[in-house]
């Protein structure tokens, strides 16, 4: 009932609400239709995009307009189009709503002339649903690209600068305004910077000038100029834009030509000037003069000075010439001091005059110093010496010191030899002539004359002692003596002559000569020995021994004849019998008796024939046939042949020519038989003669004959003769090359080559040529117009050695053709024509000539555009006007007409000649000047001074500007108003009206002045205007209180508006207006025209200008309002403003990069190099302080230091054995003595030694080289840099040249320059040999460049290796006995040390064994159930990674030692085993152990997990070992160790490998002996529990226990079954997950009871030197910190185990990941972990099933983790989420239950863990647990390396204090603060029992696992509010795992 009532009651309200909803929904539907065409984005309505200019066509402008609606498809809702699309730059894709650039056929250019900066279009959107239209604006901004280079307005620029211009002066401002470079780009791309570039053709230009302000381009002088060095510079100036990307900047260059003007910087220079080498200085000059004594001035003036005194100004080109200074001469000082009495020098001409006669008795000489200086007030004097000698009066005659002279000369003496005064010719003949007028010690300057033999002898012209010399050779044989007289003459007096007798000494210059060459002698058989045969006589013209002759028979005598050596008589030898018919030919030699070296000789032949004693034979010719050749040029009478016959009886013989000479050409002597030439021969008529000659002794039968055959040889006695019948007048056509002209022919009657004729041309060889047959051709094209005929000389020459020739002249006429165009007399005609001349006026006559013959020239105008203005007569060439010209009708500056005219040959074929005619229209002054006003007004003070401006008139002329008719000038009309014209004037050019005189007029007076303006046109036109000038009252003119104002200096950094000073003026009842009228051309200052405050108007620059002088003026307001000024003396003042320099320029180093070197043997503080920085500021702002910034150098050495104020860098360390090292650092220069701005430069210093050096040996002194070293080094740099760019030559030393043995000698006249070179690319010295090649190869060029610095003759002699290098090589060639002995001794010492080292090692090992014995008893008592055997060592472990640095706290292990740590824990174990009260009672005895625990805990407190850990939150882990309560041994099990080395997080990516390389091999061997059948279970039993230092969840109220006996039985059974694992298969089985086969179990069953012994062996092994074993290497000290930290970071308290037989290698760490659940499957691992990066290897040991889980934390929700209580299937589960690892095991796993975990706590961000983490399997229980999480076991592969970093951790929860611990157990010592310790131990024991029960056996062949790449998830819980566990000892000693294993 109630329900019906409620429904009916609410129904109306529901209907109302429904209605409202329907209405609103309908309204919403309508609004939705209007959404189309709106923008789907927020922001401004306009779409703005940017695009680069010159973008390619189709560039996307807008990729999506984001307009709502659909424009395409079958049902479009909107329609899009473009509006306002100017020039159609934009295209629209309406479907995609995209905009594109449309630049087809054009370029989008932002620059002129297009100037498209932006494009604006409207996108029109039409809503098709409702019809609305919306416009969307799209603005496209065109971005500028740097696509244009700067352009200079002019191709080149020009500037002049005086050489005296100071450095820093701006010398060129020609780039200001539009005169510089422009760039049409925008923004920085269009801004111009100017820089000076290096000009290779003028290398000094960029150093001489600079552009400090690159934006202005003003060129500033950087270095001082010297006109005498260089007169012109070519400066290359580069203009570049300022594009942001330096690589995109564009540049252009221009050349600025700077001419240096000569300035007055050099003074006069005396002439002649002999320069000092390598300088511009003249050598000291001394002028000479000599005057006779007692002569009057009239006789001597002007005094002759040698050379004439003359000085010139060294500045020879000062412009204008009128500015060149004159030279004034004067005598500065002199000796004797009374020289002014006698001499005077003209100041302008330097003429020296004598003032009064000089007496030589008082003054023998004058030494004066003369001065020449400029007359312009800038003297710059020059000095010279003047020596005046006073000559004695010539009243004495010269005389000779000897009355006569005897001389000797060798006849063989050469010309120029000196006559000797002794026979041995050793001393010259001295002829001394003196004059008593001259001192005996001075040259009297006499003239000596010879009266004879002047062509043979001469006397030297000067000197006191004269010598005779030979002018031509003498011959003693011709003349033996010469006698002549010598006279001396002094110009006035003559001496008495003396006789000189010269005797010519003989020389062996003649050879003994026989009269005949041969002699014929007959001897008879009846002659007896000793009889004379012939008397030979030779003649020698020499005298003495040179003329004595000795005779000797050389050959032919056969011993039958002898000769007398003295007389030359040939006689028959003794005992010789002559035989008829024998003949002899004796060779006889005649020799003189001169010395053997000079001896001469000749020979003759004596023919001897033996005859019978009576006459029995006729005469007989020597031969029957004679043949000879006779030249036809032989002279008449020449002897041709000797036809002498012999008659045995000696009868007289008669000779005759019997036949062959009818013309009697030859003569034969009848008596002698000599045949001679009787007449001249002519070969051309008779060329051979055969003569028959006879010889008769008078008897009838006494006649014999002989034949003479004479051949006449030719001589060149005939010249070639031209054929006279060939034509000699020839012709040839012009302009034809190789044209035949004609032919000549010549013959020669001579024979052979003498008759061969050769032709040549005597002239015009370049125009004609002639062939060997005489044909003549043209060599080039002839031009008749140049020359119409030629007279060609043809030369015919025969072929003789001395040829004869003849010539023939040919007349050649050149025939004309039409080959020339008419040529105007001028190529350009320029004529001035007045405007307005009438038509028909002739104004020019042009003329053209055609050089061709018969040409008829006609003229016409070629340019058709002027034919209506001008007419040209076709024949006369007269040019006239067709219409009048008007100057004003032409454009400005173009009142001229230029056109072409041509001249052509009417009958010719050549093109016409062309000329240019320029008609300049002259303006004829059409308009007069017109004033801007008719009446001007002005005001003036009554006392205005002369030149005071009053007002300015202005007139304009309408004539074209720039012409004389438009130039307006002004003058005063003095006719209308004469008095005003007398006191006022107008400036002719400016029109400014000024006062002509100083005024003194009455106030209020008004003057009228008529000013006339006139032009310079023709005729002159003018106009006039009136100026009314009012004289003001003095009180109306303001007066300044001061004439000069000097405000305080203004800082150059003063901002605009900074007040400089205040000026003030006063006037009666006047408002004053101030203004600056002069001195402010740069607009640097402004003035408040009311207050007079002067302020800074624009930036100042002290370096540009240091002061300003402003002229300010004060005027009354009335005057100003009248636009007038009234200047006067009182209303103007000067303001002197000084600019104060500020430190606004940083220092700039001369170089950006300095290169230097230092030798290895350099001493401390040796100078390296000097740096220098300059500053444009002044004062202290330019005073530098230098410092160095040097990178750290080993051992904390500084390396280098710099002198603070000099910039000299010095060494600050020694560089021994540091060759090839280098240092790079920076040098900082700070101005203001280190307090101001700074600049920096880089410095490179390379360490070298003499192995890098070369010595340059020069023949100049070291002092000269040292002075010029900078210039010389620059030259060497240039040549080295040709090979290695940027290289620097460094000078090591400059010294005297060293030479000799071992370079022990020094020569200071020569220099050794030791250098080396640094390569900036390698920063090291260039190889010595390479440096030698660079320099030696250019030695000639270097010497040429060194010449100006070395001087004449200076050069480099050689380039050699330093002496130290040579000595080092010598010392290194052999090894001395001392070195060998030292090496042998060192070898012996090493051999002796090896046994000692071995003894120490053995002793140390025995000591370790004894320490291990101490632990045996404890190990026996702590024996536990038998463990399974350990797995064998892997066959091939991977190489270990490099060890990281040891963790913090590791030093404790090193200090205590492993044995000490072990003993401490054993002692603690025994104390625990004594009972519950053992620890408290014996606390004192264990103080050491507690102290160790405390120190160890404290050492771990600083360790951190992620970044530095706060002191209040330390996180060291606690590791305890627990066993079940029922086990009496485990109940009192002590804490042994937890090997946790804290590591810094910065090394967490590198796993610990400490000691691995040293101990791994040894520990692997030992581990095999330690393995036993109980080892595996023993390790599992004794897995440690790790408590991290964090607040835990609450522990359960009571522990759950299991039956210990049942658990032990099960454990032992599993152990026996697992013994089947073969020892060699280490890692192939797991004690928790797999079982051994039966065979292996039986095989090792006997080892079950050997646990104690094995434990003892293990302890022994550990204590005897091996802290690690391969079986337990994963529990080693080096790996434990990583695992422990991983558990701290990544897990809640849990139990994690790792089987003892598994060798797990921890992978690099990963950041922990927190997951909520995990389902895992287990499989039997092969127990070798993979070492892939970012992987973890671990195993899960389940908790015993009987352990109760702790209660969950009530307030925190937690997602459950489901665990199954039944075995998991073999197939893998569903794919886990990322970062999870799934394990597939072939065997069933223990049942698990779902364990809800507590929610995660609020933890700090997890850091990168230092090592991988292992996570345990959660306990198999159905009760939720809060103290554990689960993680799958690791899949291990057999390829892993040493698993030293794999451990197991167990983290039990902390106990709640309210639960308490069991009463019968009280923790002792360090465990006293652990809560609920018994429950924890029991839980752990039950867990291990559960492990044994739930590990069924597995097939060994299937035992293979793989370590996954990712960790499974984990859940980390932490509660900040829980109390922390007490610190426990974190042990360092590595104990056997049977007692305690820690992570």
UniProtKB/Swiss-Prot annotation:
Residues 27-1381 are extracellular. Pfam families: Cadherin (PF00028), ECD (PF18432), PCDH15_12th (PF23206). The gene is Pcdh15. Residues 45-152, 153-270, 283-400, 401-514, 515-621, 622-722, 724-824, 825-931, 932-1040, 1042-1149, 1150-1264 form the Cadherin domain. It comes from Mus musculus (Mouse). GO terms for biological process: actin filament bundle assembly; actin filament organization; adult walking behavior; auditory receptor cell stereocilium organization; detection of mechanical stimulus involved in equilibrioception; detection of mechanical stimulus involved in sensory perception of sound; homophilic cell adhesion via plasma membrane adhesion molecules; inner ear auditory receptor cell differentiation. Expressed in brain and sensory epithelium of the developing inner ear. Expressed in the retina, in the photoreceptor inner segments, the outer plexiform layer, the inner nuclei layer and the ganglion cell layer and, more diffusely in the inner plexiform layer (at protein level). Not detected in the retinal pigment epithelium (at protein level). Expressed in the spleen, dorsal root ganglion, dorsal aspect of neural tube, floor plate and ependymal cells adjacent to the neural canal. Residues 1403-1943 are cytoplasmic. CDD domains: Cadherin_repeat (cd11304). GO terms for cellular component: cytoplasm; extracellular region; membrane; photoreceptor outer segment; plasma membrane; stereocilium; stereocilium bundle. InterPro entries: Cadherin-domain_protein, Cadherin-like_dom, Cadherin-like_sf, Cadherin_CS, EC_dom, EC_dom_sf, PCDH15_12th_dom. This is Protocadherin-15. Residues 1480-1489, 1498-1509 have a biased composition (Basic and acidic residues). The chain crosses the membrane at residues 1382-1402.
